Amino acid sequence: GIMGDILNMYGLFPCKIKAGVFAFCTRGTIRVTINLDEHTARANDFITLLPNTFIQIHEVSEDAEVCFVAFSSRFLESINFIRTISNLIVTIIENPVVPLSGNAAAIYKDFFSLLVRADNAPDSILFTDSLKPVLDLLIQGVVNMYRRFNTWKEPVLSRDKEIAREFVQLVWQYYTKERSAS
């Protein structure tokens, strides 16, 4: 996993992440702005960052540790990632940090530990062909996670935010329609 001191290096400026990132906070806290909304990730929180997300880390506790896996936007396009999660996109954008139950957190901790072991082994089994099933597991986990978690923050939206939300939904609908036609 990535430790707090390395995470602090990303706090100097906001950056755009082109990849899709699935992360799991194993300990500590991280105060971060994701697409202009501030969040705090704590131990046992799962973080989903869609491609082209803007992120800035503000504060990281000394004991913070995050495990993550990132997939290039090209790889995600090749497996129709956006179509798979299309009905959850706005929810994911508005709620990128999800607290997990103890049991689910233990499973994700084991999952990420296994990925690290597989990647660091001299005879690594992680190749492009083997990454699709890994991504499939993560996607299904995220879909189930977002369907089960029903206490999403529903902020009182200003008219500007309401228009922006509707615009994002329309853009994603158009994107998935265009991608399915090709």
For each predicted feature, which ranges?
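Generic protein-terminus/edge-of-domain signal
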Residues: 1-42
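Short hydrophobic beta-strand segments that form the core of ligand-binding sensory/regulatory domains
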Residues: 21-23, 66-70, 90
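Conserved metal-binding segment of the jelly-roll/cupin
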Residues: 41-54, 70
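Ligand-binding loop in jelly-roll beta-barrel domains
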Residues: 53-74, 80-82
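Double-stranded beta-helix
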Residues: 76-92
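Amphipathic alpha-helical segments enriched in hydrophobic/aromatic residues interleaved with Lys/Arg
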Residues: 90-137, 141, 145, 167
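Short, Lys/Arg-enriched, Trp-marked, Pro/Gly-tolerant hinge/linker segments that flank
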Residues: 100, 123-130, 143-181
